[in-house]
Design a protein with these regions (language model features):
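RNase III-family endoribonuclease catalytic core
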Residues: 32-145, 154-155
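Pyridoxal 5′-phosphate
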Residues: 164-168
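Short, basic, low-complexity termini and linkers enriched in Ser/Thr/Gly/Pro
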Residues: 1-34, 192
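Short acidic capping loops at alpha-helix termini that bridge into adjacent secondary structure
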Residues: 158-161
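Active-site phosphate/pyrophosphate- and oxyanion-stabilizing loops and adjacent acidic/basic residues
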Residues: 149
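Mobile acidic interaction elements
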Residues: 171-173
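C-terminal edge-of-domain segments
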Residues: 176-192
């Protein structure tokens, strides 16, 4: 049995003990002591000619850019929503609204660092991150190593199991026509 397996088993055992003690549950989902949390995030932005396209904090094109209030990094926006969802803290629009000029042109990295800092303060750490990009262009494969390195650096851990994959919509809808780009992110958090 590995150290991670032992830690997981101990966490599950502790969770079962807490439930069997019939402790009252706090209505704030973030305060419920569960050993693991899973969150899913999604983001989509229309694309326009010119500017630059950032994915996971990496410039992947200087031919197209997202129509967005901030820098429009769909990977980081989906990641923030996944982290917020796992903790039961709402969504990115509640925390960084596009109606607030403070976030106009903001680097999405700030959103990730702010939210993940709060997640860690609440006693959780990221174990796993899985990202799926949906885009006709640009092709993502050449950028995947840099994107993964950027995500790990942003999250402060080389040890996070992270994956980035991409697909197309086979010419269907706005994504398939190259008019938009989208990302899904799934995170698994563990109680520290």
């Amino acid at each position: 049995m590995t150290n991670n397996e032992i830690r997981i088993q101990e966490s599950i055992s502790n969770y079962e003990l807490r439930i069997s003690n019939d402790e009252p549950m706090n209505e704030n989902p973030a305060s419920i002591l569960i050993p693991f949390r899973i969150g899913h995030g999604y983001d989509l932005h229309r694309l326009q000619p010119g500017g630059r396209l950032l994915l996971a904090g990496i410039v992947v094109s200087d031919q197209i850019s997202p129509v967005a209030h901030s820098d429009g990094d769909v990977v980081l926006h989906a990641l923030v929503d996944a982290l917020l969802g796992a903790m039961g803290w709402g969504d990115i629009g509640e925390h960084f609204p596009d109606t607030d000029l403070k976030w106009k042109g903001a680097a999405s990295r700030v959103f990730v660092e702010t939210v993940y800092g709060q997640v860690r303060q609440a006693g959780y750490e990221l174990l796993n991150l899985d990202v799926t990009l949906l885009a006709e262009k640009p092709k993502i494969k050449p950028f995947k190593p840099a994107m993964l390195a950027s995500l790990r650096e942003m999250l402060g851990s080389e040890g996070i199991a992270a994956n980035v994959k991409a697909g197309t919509n086979e010419g269907c809808d706005a994504i398939g026509r190259g008019e938009a780009i989208a990302a899904h992110a799934v995170v698994m958090l563990a109680k520290t």
